[in-house]
């Protein structure tokens, strides 16, 4: 039986997977029939995370090939949002810096919205006291 699956490459703690069409009886990283794409889970910055040859995959699926669960998930992810699937992630430092910037913006916005509310609150009690005086009369 022919299967579309991941073949691991890359170095220690730095995985890189080729998406291959292979005979199920062959080893995971062994002999394959055709290479139809790749998946780089450690992609950063401008690196492409997922690349698939859709025509060849559909050809093999029409021929009766089965997909592994992970490959099936990757195909769905690519069909759902191609830009998100291909976009690489951020480095740890970049992510922390971005979070700090967003927190600072949110804090500035919160302070800016509190100041007008405080001014309105100062003006509001005289209006309420006038309304209360009007009710008493």
Curated annotation (Swiss-Prot):
GO molecular function: structural constituent of ribosome
Residue ranges of coiled coil: none
Basic and acidic residues composition bias: residue spans: 80-99, 111-125
Biological processes, Gene Ontology terms: translation
Residues spanning the signal sequence: none
Biased composition (Low complexity): 126-137
HAMAP family on file: Ribosomal_bS16 (MF_00385)
Family designation: Belongs to the bacterial ribosomal protein bS16 family.
Annotated protein name in UniProt: Small ribosomal subunit protein bS16
Name of encoding gene: rpsP
